[in-house]
C-alpha cells in the first residue's frame, strides 16, 4: 500500500477532507501517525478523535522538526501551497532526508498498485481543467454506469478517493471503473498516477497565488497523464494542446481531441452544423469496414484515412445548456470510448444528464427572460465559457474577489453578448476599468440583491440574466453556494412581483 515501505510512519500536513482521508487510510493499515495543522483546533480534529484514530496531533506553524522521530512519508493536503515559506522549508528538509512527499492521489495510486497484485485491475478515468470538471466527471460516471459498469466517482468532487476506496473494500464492492475529478492542487504531488484515459478540458488563469505562475499551474494539470494514458485534449485551447504528442510519436495514436468545430483527424470529436442544426460528431475512416480496423489503422499510422463526419446526436438533445457543455459532453464520451465502452448506451446517457447546481443552471424563466445561476463561475475562464456558451443577449452580474486575475479575456464576449453588466464586490473597480472599452453599460451595486433587481429591469424578452461572477465569493458570502442562494432568493422576489412562479 505504501510502495516498498511496510507500515511507515506518516506525517499528515493539514486536516481537511483529504488530510483526514489520508489519516484514516494510514491508520487502517497500521501506520504510526503524526498530524500537523497550522490551526490549533481544525474542524476535522473532533472527527479524528471520535473515530479513535491513534495519532499525535501538533497544532501551530509547520517546522522541519515535524519530520523527526522516523517519518518516512509526508502526506500533503491539497489546500496547502508548497510555495508558502514554512511549508517550502519543511518539504525541502524532507527531500534532503529522502522522505517521500505524497498527496492523496499518490496514496490512491499506490493502493491500486498493491491491490493489483491480488488481481484487481479497474479502469481509471481522470478529468482536470480550470472549468467544467465536476460536470464532466459526473457525466462520465453516468455514461459508464449506463454501460453496465460498477462505477465510483471521487476526488475533488468528494468523497475523498481513499475514503471511497476503503468503503468499496469494506463492502466487497470494488468498482469496475474509477472516475476521478482532479484539481491542480491534487495533481501537484502526483508521482506514479497513470490512468487509462484522462482529459484536460481547458487551462485558463486560476490559482496563480497557489502555484506561483501560469506555467506551473499548467504543468500541474499535465501530471494527469501517465506514460500509457490515452490523452483527451481540447483542441480549441492552445495551453491544453501543448500536451499533445508530436505527430508520429509513439503515443500519438493514444491522443484524442474534442472541440467545437468539425474534427479533421480520425477518432476525434467535435460539432458539425447542417441546416441550422449542430450535431455531435466523430471523425471516422470512410474506408474502414469496422471500428476495430479503423483503430488498428490509426495505431499503425500506415494508412491515410478518408475522413467522414459520423453524426452521434443533435447538440440540442443535450439537457445541459451552452456550447461549453457540448464540449464537456464530447470529452465525457471520448473518455468512455477510450476504455472501449459501446457507443449506444453512452449516447442514451448523454440525453439523460441534467447538469449540476450552480453551473450555468437555468433556475427560472420570467416574462421570457432566463435567470441563470453560474455562481460556480469563480474565474474569468468560466465566465467567458458561460457567455459564449449561452450565445444570447445577456445582462451579466459579475464581481467579487478576483484572486489577482487578468480580466481582459472578458472584453470580447462582453462586447458581443452583454446588454449590460452589473458589478458587485471587492474587485468591481478592476472589472469596470477593464470593460470600459466595450461600451457596454456598467453599473455598480452594493449588494447582489440590488444587482439582480436592476438586471431584471434591463433584460428584454429572449435575454438571460446571468450570475457568473468570474470571482471568488468570500468577500461577500460564505461560499459560492451561499451566493447562489442569495441570487435565487432575489429571483423568487422578482417572480412574486411579476405574478410568476419559479
From Swiss-Prot:
Q: Please tell me where this protein is predominantly located.
A: cytoplasm
- The record's disulfide annotation reads none
Q: Name one GO cellular component term.
A: cytoplasm
Instruction: Look up keyword Cell wall biogenesis/degradation and say if it applies.
Output: yes
GO molecular function terms attached to this record: ATP binding; UDP-N-acetylmuramoylalanine-D-glutamate ligase activity
Q: What is its EC number?
A: 6.3.2.9
Places the protein is found:
Cytoplasm
Known catalytic reactions:
UDP-N-acetyl-alpha-D-muramoyl-L-alanine + D-glutamate + ATP = UDP-N-acetyl-alpha-D-muramoyl-L-alanyl-D-glutamate + ADP + phosphate + H(+)
The pathway to which it is assigned is:
Cell wall biogenesis; peptidoglycan biosynthesis
Q: Does the keyword ATP-binding apply?
A: yes
Entry keyword set:
ATP-binding, Cell cycle, Cell division, Cell shape, Cell wall biogenesis/degradation, Cytoplasm, Ligase, Nucleotide-binding, Peptidoglycan synthesis
Task: Specify the enzyme's EC class, one word.
Answer: ligase
Annotated GO biological processes are: cell division; cell wall organization; peptidoglycan biosynthetic process; regulation of cell shape
Q: Where does ATP bind?
A: 129-135
Protein role: Cell wall formation. Catalyzes the addition of glutamate to the nucleotide precursor UDP-N-acetylmuramoyl-L-alanine (UMA).
Query: Which family does the record assign?
Result: Belongs to the MurCDEF family.
What is the name of the protein in this document? UDP-N-acetylmuramoylalanine--D-glutamate ligase
The opening ranks of the lineage are: Bacteria, Pseudomonadati, Pseudomonadota, Betaproteobacteria, Burkholderiales
Amino acid at each position: 500500500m505504501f510502495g516498498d515501505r511496510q507500515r511507515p510512519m506518516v506525517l499528515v500536513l493539514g486536516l481537511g477532507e483529504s488530510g483526514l482521508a489520508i489519516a484514516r487510510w494510514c491508520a487502517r493499515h497500521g501506520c504510526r501517525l503524526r498530524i500537523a495543522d497550522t490551526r490549533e483546533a481544525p474542524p476535522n480534529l473532533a472527527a479524528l478523535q471520535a473515530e479513535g484514530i491513534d495519532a499525535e496531533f501538533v497544532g501551530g506553524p509547520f517546522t522541519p522538526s515535524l519530520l523527526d522521530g522516523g517519518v518516512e512519508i509526508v502526506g500533503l493536503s491539497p489546500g496547502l501551497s508548497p510555495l508558502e515559506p514554512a511549508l517550502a522549508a519543511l518539504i525541502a528538509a524532507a527531500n534532503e532526508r529522502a522522505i517521500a512527499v505524497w498527496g492523496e492521489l499518490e496514496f490512491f495510486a499506490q493502493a491500486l498498485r498493491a491491490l493489483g497484485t491480488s488481481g484487481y485491475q479497474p479502469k481509471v478515468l481522470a478529468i482536470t481543467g480550470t472549468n467544467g470538471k465536476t460536470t464532466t466527471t459526473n457525466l462520465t460516471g453516468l455514461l459508464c454506469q449506463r454501460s453496465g459498469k460498477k462505477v465510483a466517482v471521487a476526488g475533488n468532487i468528494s468523497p475523498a478517493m481513499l475514503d471511497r476506496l476503503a468503503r468499496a473494500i469494506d463492502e466487497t464492492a470494488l468498482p469496475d471503473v474509477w472516475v476521478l475529478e482532479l484539481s491542480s492542487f491534487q495533481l501537484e504531488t502526483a508521482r506514479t498516477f497513470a490512468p487509462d484515459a484522462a482529459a484536460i478540458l481547458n487551462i485558463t488563469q486560476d490559482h496563480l497565488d497557489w502555484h506561483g505562475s501560469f506555467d506551473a499551474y499548467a504543468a500541474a494539470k499535465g501530471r494527469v497523464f501517465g506514460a500509457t494514458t490515452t490523452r483527451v485534449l481540447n483542441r480549441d485551447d492552445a495551453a491544453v494542446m501543448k500536451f499533445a504528442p508530436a505527430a508520429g510519436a509513439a503515443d500519438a495514436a493514444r491522443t484524442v481531441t474534442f472541440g467545437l468545430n468539425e474534427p479533421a483527424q480520425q477518432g476525434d470529436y467535435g460539432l458539425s452544423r447542417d441546416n441550422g442544426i449542430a450535431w455531435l460528431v466523430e471523425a471516422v475512416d470512410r474506408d474502414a469496414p469496422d471500428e476495430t480496423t479503423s483503430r488498428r489503422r490509426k495505431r499503425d499510422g500506415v494508412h491515410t484515412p478518408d475522413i467522414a463526419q459520423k453524426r452521434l446526436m443533435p447538440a440540442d438533445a443535450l439537457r445541459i445548456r451552452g456550447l461549453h457543455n457540448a464540449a464537456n459532453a464530447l470529452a465525457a464520451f471520448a473518455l468512455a470510448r477510450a476504455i472501449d465502452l459501446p457507443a449506444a448506451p453512452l449516447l442514451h446517457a448523454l440525453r439523460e444528464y441534467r447538469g449540476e447546481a450552480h453551473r450555468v443552471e437555468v433556475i427560472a424563466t420570467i416574462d421570457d427572460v432566463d435567470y441563470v445561476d453560474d455562481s460556480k463561475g469563480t474565474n474569468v475562464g468560466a465566465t467567458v465559457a458561460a457567455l459564449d456558451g449561452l450565445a444570447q443577449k445577456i445582462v451579466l452580474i459579475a464581481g467579487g474577489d478576483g484572486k489577482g486575475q487578468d480580466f481582459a479575456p472578458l472584453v470580447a464576449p462582453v462586447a458581443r453578448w452583454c446588454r449590460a453588466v452589473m458589478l458587485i464586490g471587492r474587485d468591481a473597480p478592476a472589472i469596470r476599468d477593464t470593460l470600459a472599452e466595450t461600451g457596454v453599460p456598467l453599473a455598480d451595486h452594493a449588494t447582489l440583491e440590488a444587482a439582480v433587481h436592476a438586471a431584471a429591469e434591463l433584460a428584454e424578452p429572449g435575454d438571460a440574466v446571468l450570475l457568473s461572477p468570474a470571482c471568488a465569493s468570500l468577500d461577500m458570502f460564505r461560499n459560492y453556494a451561499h451566493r447562489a442562494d442569495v441570487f435565487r432568493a432575489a429571483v423568487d422576489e422578482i417572480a412574486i412581483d411579476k405574478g410568476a412562479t419559479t
